[in-house]
Amino acid sequence: MEEIQGYLQLDRSQQHGFLYPLIFQEYIYALAHDHSLNRSILLENPVYDNKSSFLIVKRLITRIYQQNHFIIFANNSNQNLFFGHNKNLYSQTISEGLAFIVEIPFYIRLISSQGGKGILKFRNLRSIHSPFPFLENNFSHLNSVLDILIPHPVHLEILVQNLRYWVKDASSLHLLRFFFHEYWNWNTLIDRKKPSFDFSPKRNQKLFFLLYNSHVCEYESIFFFLRKQSSHLRSTSFGVFLERIYFYEKKERLVEVFAKDFQASLWLFKDPFIHYVRYQGKSILVSNGTPLLMNKWKSYLVNFWQCHFGIWFHPGRVYINQLPNYSFNFMGYLSSVRLNHSMVRSQMLENAFLINNAIKKFDTLVPLIPLIGSLAKAKFCNLLGHPISKPIWTDLADSDIIDRFWHICRNLSHYYSGSSKKKSLYRIKYILRLSCAKTLARKHKSTVRAFLKGLGSEFLEKFLTSEEEALSLTFSRTSSTFRGVYRNRIWYLDIIYINDLTNYQ
């Protein structure tokens, strides 16, 4: 986003918060397309396309200029006058541009609030691994958890209203509203039966994440307000992302839901040990409170979604569980709080006692069965975990085939470096290693035994040291602590995208 600062300073329309003129600027679409190509090192094959060019952007801008009014053909979307026959290509281009433009107010407010400081820390907190140290420090002292499935789809007008707090330009909002309804007619992102937006990350990921985050930000703002009002809690400033108008609206909504004075109802939610974490399409609310308090939270959330967002939120989407007896899937890990029992012998005069100490510990395990299912879906093995060859890679060079399998092993070792027990990764490495050998043997029309015998020990060594290669990104091989760190949990702050093999849900 740093590239656009110079353009924004030259554009006087930004002084008044007008974003609509940026839609007609070619560099916006070029920057948006380049920004969408950025991928994490965990992605195996970044998708690069050459469909975005200045010629296409010029043609799109010309059509926007020449179109006096937007005509939507609900029954014959293939002959749309605005996008023409290349509607899919134009929709991808304009969605990237719109998402990039609407992000500008968020970015400007972030930069102004940070004052050029703390940006590196903010980027580190974007890591997928960043919540895990927080969970380790806090979840071991809590006992109750609300497992929440965030409801969707959402009505189109609610999405526009959510963005209205950030985008003050009415013209941009009108264009967004038109674009949402146009997608509704195309039946790509929106169900034709209902004028509601169904979040689908498979297409237009940038626009999807922008809309989804604005939608969830509206929902999560009430947690900050309740946290701020509680006298027992420390308040962390999130003024960059939230406006005061949010809190007053949620305050009135809370009064309507409980039909009583707000301050009289607030005491139900005062809890000094409440924590909230969101991941993918789920969120968890963990507390040390009683079951009565957790049921009140559940009732409030159900009523809040139904009253404020106007959608049916079934109570069955909120599950109340006890942490010591509950395991939940969190970012590709199977997480739980387990008790570690240790016997201590105590001697008092002539009497000896055995004391059983139970210590709670946040545990993160590799979900072996779902991960094998992901490998089977990617055609590395069958459903039973038996390795198979990868026929579509037999046309590649031997070095390319080995590098592809090795990168997958390294990425999995990198991602699951925080696992409490890493023995499950040995099974995954074995599957990938043997799948690589079968792929190479199939290419050379040989048996696996004969091929491994001719290849030597270097082939095995590269896969066995893939985890050490990942750890060496942080710790030097010559460091005396490297051998000890190798067996402990490590959380990285550079993992921004989740690997496809770990995203098994």
UniProtKB/Swiss-Prot annotation:
Recorded GO terms, molecular function? RNA binding
Signal peptide location: none
Which Gene Ontology cellular-component terms appear in the entry? chloroplast
Write the lineage as a comma-separated list.
Eukaryota, Viridiplantae, Streptophyta, Embryophyta, Tracheophyta
Q: Indicate what this protein is called per its UniProt record.
A: Maturase K
Among the GO biological process terms of this entry, one is: mRNA processing
Q: Which UniProt keywords apply?
A: Chloroplast, mRNA processing, Plastid, RNA-binding, tRNA processing
Q: What is the scientific name of the source organism? A: Coffea arabica (Arabian coffee)
**What's one Pfam family here?**
Intron_maturas2
Chief localization class?
plastid
The text of the family note is: Belongs to the intron maturase 2 family. MatK subfamily.
Q: What does this protein do?
A: Usually encoded in the trnK tRNA gene intron. Probably assists in splicing its own and other chloroplast group II introns.
Where found, per UniProt?
A: Plastid, Chloroplast
InterPro entries per the UniProt record, alphabetical:
Domain_X (IPR024937), Maturase_MatK (IPR002866), Maturase_MatK_N (IPR024942)
